[in-house]
Amino acid sequence: MTALKLPSLPFALEPAGSPPPGCRVRSGVMTLTAAARTDMFVDPAGTGPVPDAGRFVGLPPAGDFTLAAQVSVEFASMYDAGVLLLHAAERDWAKLCFEYSPQLKPTAVTVVTRGTSDDCNSFEVDGSTLWLRITRSGAAWAFHASTDGAWWRLLRYFTLGLELVRVGFLAQSPAGAGCAATFDHVTFRPGAPENLRDGS
C-alpha cells in the first residue's frame, strides 16, 4: 500500500501495522475500514499478544501544532472506533478515540501506552460524530474532544518521553467483524492554544 497525501496535511501518511486498513480518500475526506479483530492495546494485566492494527501515520514538522478532524464511525460492535494516533515505538503510543463502549454508547476514549496501556472513558456522545484534536505543546501532548468543533474539552495531558513521534489515523474493531471510520474537515495548524483548559 502506498503513502497517502491529504491536502490539509504538510506531511505524507505512510501505511504501518498489519493487516492494513481499507482506505478511500475523496475530496480530502478519508475513510478507513478496519479488518476484523484489529486493535492497538497492550493489556496492563499482561494477557494477550501485542496488537499492531493497520494505520496511516506520518512525521509532522518540528514545533507545536494541532491536528483535528471530525470523526464519524459506523458503530456495530463494542470497541469499534475511529482514532487519532500518536506513535513513537511499539510500546510507546497514544490513542484519542471515538469508540463504542461496552454499553454500546458512542464515547470519547483515550489510551496512553508506555510499556502497557491505560484506558480512560471520558464522556458519552449522542450520535455517530465527534470532533477530535491532538495538540503538541513543547514536550507535552494534549487530547481534546468537541461535539461542535468550537468548544474543546481537555481529556488528557501527558508526555510519551520521546522526541520522534508520528501522528495519524486508525480504525479499529477489536471485538467485531470490521469497522469504517470517516475523517472529515482534517486540519493541521502550527502552534498550540495558549490555554489548553479553557475550551479554546
What are these regions (language model features)?
Residues M1-S200:
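Extracellular glycan-recognition regions
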